[in-house]
Swiss-Prot record:
It holds the Pfam family ATP-synt_Eps. GO terms for cellular component: mitochondrial inner membrane; proton-transporting ATP synthase complex. Mitochondrial membrane ATP synthase (F(1)F(o) ATP synthase) produces ATP from ADP in the presence of a proton gradient across the membrane which is generated by electron transport complexes of the respiratory chain. F-type ATPases consist of two structural domains, F(1) - containing the extramembraneous catalytic core, and F(o) - containing the membrane proton channel, linked together by a central stalk and a peripheral stalk. During catalysis, ATP synthesis in the catalytic domain of F(1) is coupled via a rotary mechanism of the central stalk subunits to proton translocation. Its main location: mitochondrion. It comes from the Eukaryota. This is ATP synthase subunit epsilon, mitochondrial. Signal peptide: none annotated. Belongs to the eukaryotic ATPase epsilon family. Residues 1-9 form a transit peptide. InterPro entries: ATP_synth_F1_esu_mt, ATP_synth_F1_esu_sf_mt.
């Protein structure tokens, strides 16, 4: 049991195949769920857990990328 938990601590979210956007959304959701009700509105005004990846589509607009690559070099 201890060996297994040490192995989990030594690896990061990238090692588990989680993209930065998924990591950012989970951290934002966690922050919103742990703050007091009176402070939650303040945090929700400045951050929402719905970050998406976008890239220019060539016509001056933005195209949303649904399947985000795990590694930055794959963009």
């Amino acid at each position: 049991m201890i060996r297994r938990s040490c192995a989990l601590l030594s690896s990061s979210w990238r090692d588990h195949g989680i993209s930065y956007l998924k990591y950012l959304n989970v951290c934002t959701e966690t922050l919103h769920s742990t703050v007091k009700e009176s402070r939650r509105a303040k945090y929700e005004r400045w951050s929402k857990p719905c970050y998406t990846a976008q890239r220019p589509d060539g016509a001056g607009g933005q195209e949303t990328i649904d399947k985000v690559p795990i590694h930055t070099k794959d963009y």
